[in-house]
Amino acid sequence: QRGDSDDAVFMAAGNVDDGSRLQESRLSSAVDGTGSASSVMSWATKGDVKGVSAASCVTPELEQRFLVSGTKTGMTQQLVVANPSTKATSVDIKIWGAGKSGALALSTGATLVVGAGKETVMNLAAAASDQDALYVAVSSDDTPVAAVVRTVAMDGLTSKGSEYTVPNNTMSTTLAVAGLSAGDSASLYLFSKADAEITVSWT
């Protein structure tokens, strides 16, 4: 579909109940303002994942990195890796925790096999338990993959919500975090490949 105004937007929606989906866009023309974008959203009114989770869709890459909240009691972190190609691939996982320097020795192994057109889920809480925060690196040698981290928070039997974390592959010397209001309780997670001094300010 082609449009010549800001209101000319084509939208498609559908249910995804049995695994990841691949979107492929082929534009008949490439002019300023054309393109495609996708997002995913899930919601539930009861159960362990009660609430709303949303994220932009992920572009397959050979390497993807995540900075996520930890694996203390009540927090479940699931790494979901999808392989859109026509051949299986092996994916290497490295995880750093908040307690010490260097990558952690994982309790569940550090390699995932993802079948062609399939997805594989790794329980990060089982692989690196009792951590205040995790930095996760996902690497595929030959085939680009798409990955997200699905977080579920529980307080005993009470659901505290769920969320998706998408890859954050860019490091910077200056970052700004929006979306906080006066009185909010917030935790800041930082990762550096080398020793560094960090200055945090609020405005």
Task: Identify the meaning behind each predicted range.
Residues 32-40, 131-156:
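Predominantly extracellular/luminal regions of secreted and cell-surface proteins
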Residues 76, 105-109, 119-121, 133-135, ...:
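Transmembrane beta-barrel architecture of outer membranes
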Residues 17-23, 32-38, 44-45, 59-66, ...:
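An N-terminus-focused feature that recognizes amino-terminal "leader" regions
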Residues 3-22, 102-131, 135, 203:
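Intrinsically disordered, low-complexity Pro/Gly/Ser/Thr-rich segments with frequent PxxP/GP/PP motifs
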Residues 64-74, 86-114, 122, 128, ...:
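Intrinsically disordered, low-complexity linker/loop segments enriched in Gly/Pro
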Residues 1-35, 169-175, 179:
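Extracytoplasmic low-complexity, Pro/Thr/Ser/Ala/Gly-rich segments
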Residues 81-103, 140-141, 189-203:
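Short acidic, flexible loop segments centered on an aromatic residue
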Residues 42-80, 145-193:
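Conserved functional hotspot residues at active sites or interaction interfaces
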